[in-house]
């Protein structure tokens, strides 16, 4: 499928990317998919969505900041899959949590701190490369994902037909906000 351009000058992007016949890839994010605990949180998420680069799944990293969706947790990077070869079925837990990334020129990266460890979140130094990258989940100001639930599924696929046969959503918020006297309409 066609892939977006717009990488930094030192990088290369292919004009197309391969896709699988059986895909758990989510539809592209839209501004109306932005969500928040409060209307103000949702507004800030929409502002951030429009501030960051995002042209779909293969949007290249940028100095401005980029939405990575599906993010670093997957679709199946963390949840993995199980296959029953006799019945030709596959079960997995696709995760659809958006991340953000922002390239950092080598000259702007602070010296490595003692005991500093690599992580899925924060600064990835990319030693030897001209840029590091700051990565993390795409969260609102209240540290809740900016995209509306669900953030993933438990799913099964029929490998003989290449079709998703069953999905159950994960990442829902119950209709209460804990001990706060505020009702949350997302279920």
Where do the protein language model's features map onto the residues?
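Noncatalytic, solvent-exposed loop/strand surfaces
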Residues: 1-187
